[in-house]
Amino acid sequence: ALSALAAATLALTGCGSSQTSSSSAASASGSSSSAASQASSGKVQVFAAASLNNAGADLEKAYEAANPGVDVTFVYEGSAKLVTQIDQGATPDMLITADTKNMDKAKKLDEFSGSDSTVLVTNKLVLVTAEGNPGKINSLDDLKTTDGVVAVCKEDVPCGTLAHEELKKHDITLKNATTEGKVTDVATKVSTGNADAGFIYTTDLAAAKKKGVNLGSVDLPDVEPNEYPAALSKTGASSDAAKKFNEWLKTSDEAKK
C-alpha cells in the first residue's frame, strides 16, 4: 500500500483528481443488491512504472479483498516503454509514470488526449553498492576512478534521466557501465552481484533489504525527488470499476497504510 512507499521516502502529495479505469465485466443476478454489485465489480488494468511493483502488489490485494468481484491488475515496465506500448495500441485504464516527462508524452497520444494527471507520490534516486561493497564505492566521486561495473537505466527512462544528469553534473564518465531497461533490472544486477553499484530508487533499496539483501547506499542530496503522475485513459474514464478504485486510492486509509 501507499504507506510502504512513504516509509521508503515516497510521500503522498494527494491533491487534484486522478482516476483509474477498466472494463466492467461482472454479471449480476436479479437480486436487490445486484445493481450495487455490478457497479463495484469489473477489471481495472494499471500500467505502472517498474519502481512501483511492491506497492502495487499490496494495493491489488487490499482492494480486491475489500471489493469481491473486482480484478485489479498492475502491469510494470519502464515508463518510456509503457508509453511506447500505448502508442502501439495498448489501452490500459490508467497510467502511472515515474516522471512528468513521460506522462506528457502519453497525453499527446489519442488514448490519453485530454486526460488530467495527478501526482500521487514522489521517489528519490540513490546510488547503491553490492553487498560487501566489492567496488570500494563510498561516494559519488569514487565512480570517477572505479573499474567496477555500474548499472544505469537507459537515458529515456526516468531513473536513467536522473542518473545521467547527476553524472554529467559531477563530470563523471563511467569506465564500465551496463545499461538496463528499467530500475528493477538495475536493482537485480546489484543485488545479485552482477554489478558493483547502480542507480535505483529508495523504494527499490527498501525492497531489496526486505528480501534480506544488504545493499550499501550513497545519498545524492542534490537530486530532486521525482514525481509519479497518474492519469486515466479514455477507456478508463468510462469504467465505474476504475473510477471507484481511483477514489479508493486517493482517499482510503487502507490504501495509505
What is each PLM-predicted segment?
Residues 1-13:
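Sec-dependent bacterial lipoprotein signal peptides
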